Amino acid sequence: MEDGVELLKLAKDRRAIVWVAQEYRYMPPVAEMIRMAHAGEVGRIHQVAIREHREPFYPKVGDWNRFSANTGGTLVEKCCHYFNLMDLILGQRPTKIYASGGQRVNHLDERYAGQTPDILDSAFVVVDYPDGARAMLDLCMYAENSVDNEHITVIGDEGKLESLLPALTLRLGKRADWGKREVWGQASGTGRGVAVRRVWDTNIRYAGQHFGASYIEHQRFAAALRSGGPAEIGLEEGLRSVATGIAAHRSIASGQAVWMADVLPEGL
């Protein structure tokens, strides 16, 4: 947190923009999901759930990503973009974090300068927001053989949006389309009236990383530089997502809920 606060101070009087690379909001089905959610397609939003079931961390220079002292921990280094996505979808700042997680499978047989890696490989994180809405992250990094590694769900009082990657699929299910329950016990998972489509942005000339999101973000960054416009993702927003990850790690260590006010400096 100290480094992030120092960056805020350094950037305060700069004329040049500082843009934090939170690219997940630009992935085509996710971008469309956010647009639809903010347009009221599912009514008032009450829950956001993000599941990532994937492969372990890749090897990196100096094996720096094997130790929490270098990265801030998996929920900071790997997952801050998910927490940023939650804030963006709900349009609020988080208030309280509950988390449970650990290192169950990955890297336990590795040694670096005689030290065993300590980064967690699985966790559940629940994030509370001021109006009572909640978000949840389900992370598992020893789940390679999945059809879709990333599943983002936005649920409102009128329906549900789902984004699936790498399938690039977006689903919209409206409660009204399901119809009136005639018999208690009648299955609600029939998919009746659920709209399903594959979403791609034809503006993406090179898919690169994150299903073209990095391409789109670089385009927007370049446009902001040329026009003198503001960064779409500023340092304060980035710092809040890091703080959520730090709070989650503190919650895991203590077994207690952690208030964001105890992590973020006053005014952020």
Indicate residue ranges for each PLM-predicted region.
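Predominantly a Rossmann-like dinucleotide-binding segment in NAD(P)-dependent oxidoreductases
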Residues: A16-W19, Y24-P117, A123-F124, G255
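Glycine-rich phosphate/pyrophosphate-binding beta-alpha loops
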Residues: C80, D138-V147
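Rossmann-fold NAD(P)-binding glycine/threonine-rich loop
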Residues: M1-I17
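Hydrophobic residues in well-ordered beta-strands that form the structural core
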Residues: V18-V20, L137, S163
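A general structural signal for well-ordered alpha-helical segments in protein cores
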Residues: G4, M27-V30, Y82-F83, H218-Q219, ...
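Aromatic/hydrophobic pocket-lining residues that form π-stacking "cages" and hydrophobic walls in ligand
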Residues: L7, M33, A247
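C-terminal glycine/acidic-rich active-site capping loop/insertion
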Residues: D109-T116, F124, D128-Y129, I152-T153, ...
